[in-house]
């Protein structure tokens, strides 16, 4: 039991609003794919009524939840089902000392391992791609050997920004960029595309003086106390940025922005009220700028793309901003997929006990993409990108990178 987290965890009493319609269970991707999962109604409001009486009613079946929040999206009564489950796992979930604890630590502490791996990225990437290493990780710590581990960049985005973006403060308008772990350690090109798009709109980019992982992989793997420390750190630096520069804070990760806005107060008990209204997912900001007349010059992009909606973007209500933004790219043929969860759910699908369920959840999406005859898949979430590329075998790009592809002007950053 996590006694430190219990002291700060928020108390969720929205279970009283549950009308027992079970629409959450119908909408849950795990309940459809795994008969061992009781479903969000039983794990959430039904279970919470018992857990507030005694911790002995905690059930390890809660670990089967992906934290996709689709149950909350579906709930007609506004019950915070996913939050209940996440908080319960943080409060009562046991973490016995065994090899899977090592796996969960490695998968969730992205800053620690990213900072170690990026200087040696070619070696690390080569090693983790070896079948022998994959088999060893499967047998020892339980990372499924059929999964392709994310590749690290040889050098971080923050390092590139420091070396190449000294002119950013010269722009009259400024935005702050919460780049997250994925851009910093795995795919700096997305951050570079973000800077290029902003500069094409005559907007400069600033980074926080310091940022840590948003905390979502820590929450998912039961390290709630560490996630809360990260949240307090980030809120401190977000507040300083907003107060000093009056700049909106943008994220290119649908999960990072959702976590900064929603998970901090509702799951971790961290007050973000001073900055939450200034935090935006990037496509929301971009569409507003485009519609107000501040759109960059773009050339036609004669490509067919299929768009997959990430679960956290749907939960945050920002889906239409991305779709409408993509429609503004000239020449682009856009197909919006009728897809649900991709199944990876951050670190969930990397675990050997979840691998088959993860693939089953995403099978409809993979089939739709493979039969689409598209040039690219587009999604706002990095882990959706990994899952699609691995299982549907189609290059998957971010909406911001697609915009950068359409820009006429050369990058100025």
Locate predicted features.
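Short, intrinsically disordered, charge-biased short linear motifs at domain edges
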Residues: 2-15, 51-62, 199-201, 328-331
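Iron-sulfur cluster-binding cysteine motifs and their immediate structural context
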Residues: 23-48, 64-92, 259, 381-383, ...
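Iron-sulfur cluster-binding electron-transfer modules in prokaryotic oxidoreductases
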Residues: 6-7, 81-413
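A ubiquitous short alpha-helical element
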Residues: 52-56, 70, 105-109
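Short, charged low-complexity linear segments at domain edges
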Residues: 1-9, 36-56, 317-325
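Cysteine-centered iron-sulfur cluster-binding motifs in ferredoxin-type domains/subunits
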Residues: 12-31, 57-79, 114, 185, ...
């Amino acid at each position: 039991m996590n006694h430190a987290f219990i002291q700060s965890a928020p108390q969720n009493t929205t279970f009283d609003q549950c009308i027992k319609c079970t629409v959450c269970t119908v909408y849950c991707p795990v309940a459809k794919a795994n008969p061992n999962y009781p479903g969000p109604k039983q794990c959430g409001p039904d279970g919470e009524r018992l857990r507030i009486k005694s911790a002995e009613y905690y059930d390890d079946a809660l670990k089967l939840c992906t934290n996709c929040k689709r149950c909350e999206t579906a709930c007609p009564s506004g019950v915070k089902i996913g939050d209940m489950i996440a908080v319960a796992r943080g409060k009562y979930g046991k973490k016995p000392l065994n090899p899977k604890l090592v796996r969960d630590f490695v998968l969730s502490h992205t800053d620690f391992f990213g900072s170690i791996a990026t200087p040696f990225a070619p070696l690390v990437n080569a090693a983790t791609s070896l079948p022998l290493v994959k088999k060893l990780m499967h047998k020892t710590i339980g990372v499924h050997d059929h999964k392709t581990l994310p590749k690290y960049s040889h050098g971080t985005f923050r390092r590139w920004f420091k070396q190449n973006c000294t002119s950013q403060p010269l722009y009259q308008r400024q935005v702050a960029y919460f780049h997250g772990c994925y851009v910093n350690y795995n795919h700096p090109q997305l951050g570079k595309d973000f800077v290029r798009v902003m500069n094409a709109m005559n907007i400069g980019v600033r980074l926080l003086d310091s940022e840590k992982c948003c905390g979502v992989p820590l929450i998912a793997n039961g390290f709630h106390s560490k996630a809360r420390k990260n949240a307090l750190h980030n809120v401190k630096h977000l507040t300083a940025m907003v107060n000093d520069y009056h700049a909106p804070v943008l994220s290119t990760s649908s999960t990072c922005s959702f976590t900064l806005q929603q998970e901090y107060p509702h799951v971790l008990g961290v007050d973000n009220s001073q900055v939450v209204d200034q935090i935006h997912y990037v496509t929301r900001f971009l569409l507003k700028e485009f519609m107000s007349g501040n759109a960059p010059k773009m050339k036609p992009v004669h490509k067919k793309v299929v768009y997959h909606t990430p679960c956290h973007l749907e939960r945050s209500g920002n889906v239409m901003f991305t779709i409408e933004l993509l429609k503004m790219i000239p020449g682009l043929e856009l197909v919006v997929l009728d897809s649900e969860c991709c199944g990876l759910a951050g670190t969930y699908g990397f675990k050997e006990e979840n691998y088959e369920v993860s693939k089953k959840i995403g099978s409809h999406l993979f089939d739709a993409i493979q039969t689409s005859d598209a040039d690219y898949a587009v999604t706002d979430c990095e882990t959706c990108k990994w899952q699609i590329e691995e299982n549907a075998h189609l290059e998957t790009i971010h909406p911001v990178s697609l915009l950068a592809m359409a820009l006429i002007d050369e990058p100025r950053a």
